[in-house]
């Protein structure tokens, strides 16, 4: 692979993460603000907070997973898959899905906390951006390792780290959100 191709791949890969990041923040800033106060009152009295948070988390996983899949398909379409093996494409796609799942679980938890605290998009950004940086850094390292041809066994720990972050954010929201739900 020529050096120019690697540089353009890095630039496009970084742009793909920016698209995913903005899509995630825009997706989580809308739903709660659009809820009517009567709908919120109904939800508070009929739905357990854990169930509501799990539903939001699943919604964001599907939404960001779809955006990630489209972004990854565009990445392959515009860059071509000539230098990828079939196995590398699957490994890279697994990284994209793990990243979108970690982002979705983080943003669902942050959005729920920010909404109950009376904050809007700015609070989501302030709370979420510092926490999302490790996700992007690990994902970027994982993608770079795959592009350089490093064996999957030597870089699979990044996927485990993303899965751990996703589970940790979900568990944190599951445990803490009920205390904010009924005030």
What positions do the PLM features span?
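Single conserved hydrophobic/aromatic residue that forms the stacking wall/gate
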Residues: 1-7, 12
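Long, hydrophobic alpha-helical segments
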Residues: 13-29
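Transmembrane helix boundary and interhelical loop/hinge segments in multi-pass membrane proteins
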Residues: 24-43
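Selective transmembrane-helix segments that form parts of the transport pathway or gating/packing helices
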Residues: 49-76
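Membrane-interfacial helix-loop-helix connectors in multipass membrane proteins
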Residues: 73-95, 143-159
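Junction motif at the cytosolic side of a transmembrane helix
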Residues: 77, 166-183
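A structural motif at transmembrane helix-loop-helix junctions in multipass membrane proteins
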Residues: 95-129, 181-183
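Transmembrane alpha-helical segments of integral membrane proteins
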Residues: 105-109, 135-148
């Amino acid at each position: 692979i020529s050096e120019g191709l690697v540089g353009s791949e890095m630039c496009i890969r970084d742009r793909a993460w920016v698209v995913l990041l903005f899509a995630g923040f825009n997706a989580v800033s809308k739903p709660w603000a659009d809820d009517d106060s009567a709908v919120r009152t109904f939800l508070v009295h009929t739905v357990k907070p854990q169930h509501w948070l799990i539903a939001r988390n699943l919604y964001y996983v599907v939404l960001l997973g779809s955006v990630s899949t489209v972004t990854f398909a565009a990445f392959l379409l515009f860059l071509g898959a000539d230098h990828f093996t079939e196995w590398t494409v699957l490994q890279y796609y697994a990284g994209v899905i793990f990243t979108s799942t970690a982002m979705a679980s983080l943003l669902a938890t942050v959005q729920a906390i920010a909404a109950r605290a009376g904050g809007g998009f700015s609070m989501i950004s302030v709370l979420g951006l510092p926490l999302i940086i490790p996700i992007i850094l690990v994902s970027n390292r994982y993608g770079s390792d795959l592009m350089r041809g490093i064996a999957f066994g030597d870089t699979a720990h990044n996927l485990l780290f993303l899965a751990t972050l996703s589970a940790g954010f979900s568990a944190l929201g599951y445990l803490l959100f009920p205390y904010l739900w009924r005030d």
